[in-house]
Amino acid sequence: MKILVAVAVIFFISTQLSAEEIGANDDFNYWSDWSDSDQIKEEMPEPFEHLLQRIARRPKPQQFFGLMGKRDADSSIEKQVALLKALYGHGQLSHKRHKTDSFVGLMGKRALNSVAYERSVMQDYERRRK
């Protein structure tokens, strides 16, 4: 055991001495030469730059499919305004379903309006007690 400790100590001392010898040479001083003003910035080659731009480009919104399914690619502001007018009685009734104040998700039905939700919870509680 004492022999292993002695070998380890000799190894560490020899590495320390060799590191000091290398550190004394100025030829191996890499970090002092890293200034941007002295180096010429190389432009990326055109195909490589084009490839990076394609990778970094954001996908179009039509490419996303969420939990609610695929969205219409041609939905526009005018269609949304017409739908809102139809829902609130300012136009003809649309063929799309009516939006209500509740949301049916994976965790069950939830109200978007907190006051209405609290009222419905209290009504459900009263019905269960009877």
Swiss-Prot record:
Keywords: Amidation, Cleavage on pair of basic residues, Neuropeptide, Neurotransmitter, Secreted, Signal. It holds the Pfam family Tachykinin. The keyword Transmembrane does not apply. Residues 20-56 form a propeptide. Residues 1-19 form the signal peptide. One of its GO terms (cellular component) is extracellular space. The modification Methionine amide is found at residues 68, 107. It is found in: Secreted. The record marks 59-60, 63-67 as: Cleavage. Its main location: secreted. GO terms for biological process: cellular response to nerve growth factor stimulus; chemical synaptic transmission; inflammatory response; neuropeptide signaling pathway; positive regulation of cytosolic calcium ion concentration; response to pain; sensory perception of pain; tachykinin receptor signaling pathway. GO terms for molecular function: substance P receptor binding. Tachykinins are active peptides which excite neurons, evoke behavioral responses, are potent vasodilators and secretagogues, and contract (directly or indirectly) many smooth muscles. Belongs to the tachykinin family. This is Protachykinin-1. It comes from Bos taurus (Bovine). The gene is TAC1.
